Amino acid sequence: MSIERLGYLGFAVKDVPAWDHFLTKSVGLMAAGSAGDAALYRADQRAWRIAVQPGELDDLAYAGLEVDDAAALERMADKLRQAGVAFTRGDEALMQQRKVMGLLCLQDPFGLPLEIYYGPAEIFHEPFLPSAPVSGFVTGDQGIGHFVRCVPDTAKAMAFYTEVLGFVLSDIIDIQMGPETSVPAHFLHCNGRHHTIALAAFPIPKRIHHFMLQANTIDDVGYAFDRLDAAGRITSLLGRHTNDQTLSFYADTPSPMIEVEFGWGPRTVDSSWTVARHSRTAMWGHKSVRGQR
């Protein structure tokens, strides 16, 4: 029994209006009203994929991990009990706020709140209308992209995400942090998406380094690059990754030290996949231009 996909992300931020402008006018998501004090944003037929609420954290507040049905949720509850992982069941108010039929609330070993849920609301009768030129995002069985989790102990995090939640290692990249220093990043999948979560001991005081959204076309990436370049947010130029071979760029969000990766064209994981190790993050490109544009 394992998690099936990443369903949603919730952020607590100091500047909600800046995030609203960023997610709609730059990234192209659709504003979708609110739930409690959180503004909601759509990327597809789901009622929401990203939530932004006011808070001093300026970081990822929670991540929603999806299973297929109530029986799968109960199997995950049993697995958590067997592993000695504390959890609570979301009450009716939280289920209504998240627009799901059931959920379990827990934390990973380093304090990131996780919500394992089933039964998300879908609203096909209200088509997704992007707020900026983008043909759409790749979601469905692969979920809403990925995020890179910053952890102090990668081995401990790996044990939790693989042995308890059922993620599987795709590969490792030894990311150069200096002339003689590298950090191994472990990339984990739970469906055809090359990685839904990556784990790395990056020396930044944030829960995540970045989150990624996958667009439908290469032109979507180009148009988004121009919008975010005009906004002065580009941190890495266009490039293609070695492991998943996504063509993408990186840009600052309104919360310091958290970036978005906007990409297209990754390869997918299937039963023939074999684990590999890479010494570079990019086949080409992804030149850092932080503070230069």
From Swiss-Prot:
Entry keyword Metal-binding: yes
Pathway it works in: Xenobiotic degradation; biphenyl degradation; 2-hydroxy-2,4-pentadienoate and benzoate from biphenyl: step 3/4
Top-level enzyme category: oxidoreductase
Keyword Repeat: yes
A molecular function (GO) term: biphenyl-2,3-diol 1,2-dioxygenase activity
This protein's UniProt keywords: Aromatic hydrocarbons catabolism, Dioxygenase, Iron, Metal-binding, Oxidoreductase, Repeat
Catalytic activity as recorded in UniProt: biphenyl-2,3-diol + O2 = 2-hydroxy-6-oxo-6-phenylhexa-2,4-dienoate + H(+)
GO biological process: xenobiotic catabolic process
PROSITE patterns, per database record: EXTRADIOL_DIOXYGENAS, VOC
Obligatory cofactor(s): Fe(2+)
UniProt-listed Pfam families: BphC_D1 (PF22632), Glyoxalase (PF00903)
Superkingdom per UniProt: Bacteria
Coiled coil: none
Residues reported to bind Fe cation: H146, H210, E261
EC id: 1.13.11.39
Ranges where the VOC domain occurs: 5-119, 143-265
CDD domains for this protein: BphC1-RGP6_C_like, BphC1-RGP6_N_like
Cross-referenced NCBIfam families: 23dbph12diox
Family from the record: Belongs to the extradiol ring-cleavage dioxygenase family.
Protein name: Biphenyl-2,3-diol 1,2-dioxygenase
Natural source organism: Pseudomonas sp. (strain KKS102)
